[in-house]
Amino acid sequence: MITKYFTKIFVRFNPFGPEAKTARLFLCAIPPRQRAISTKLTNELLTANSQKTPLIKVVFKDKTEMELDPAGLSFGELSSHLDRYSRKLQLKENIESQ
């Protein structure tokens, strides 16, 4: 997963719900150095009787926001969805640098 272009990440999930695996794998895929330096990471744990829905929200360097439901996607689907936009930013960056 291309995480270079993430500036903010918000993850909300129930650790015992069906969305937990996708959310935990997503959080593990972010490099520790990036978490410490360039990306603001916020997470919120839900209880079993919480009314809030699980959510993964990513803000990219160009201020584009993507909100995804971890309960409805596998980690592979989630990462390919985010990579699609990251590749667009990477291409744009490569064109501008030439």
Swiss-Prot record:
A GO CC annotation recorded here is:
mitochondrial large ribosomal subunit
Give the record's keywords alphabetically.
Mitochondrion, Ribonucleoprotein, Ribosomal protein
What would you give as a GO molecular function for this chain, any one? Answer: structural constituent of ribosome
Q: Does the keyword Ribosomal protein apply?
A: yes
Q: Does the keyword Ribosomal protein apply?
A: yes
User: Where does the record place it?
Assistant: Mitochondrion
Q: Which Pfam families match?
A: MRP_L53
Q: Which domain of life is it from?
A: Eukaryota
The text of the family note is:
Belongs to the mitochondrion-specific ribosomal protein mL53 family.
What's its job? Answer: Component of the large subunit of mitochondrial ribosome.
Protein name in UniProt: Large ribosomal subunit protein mL53
Gene name linked to the record: MRPL44
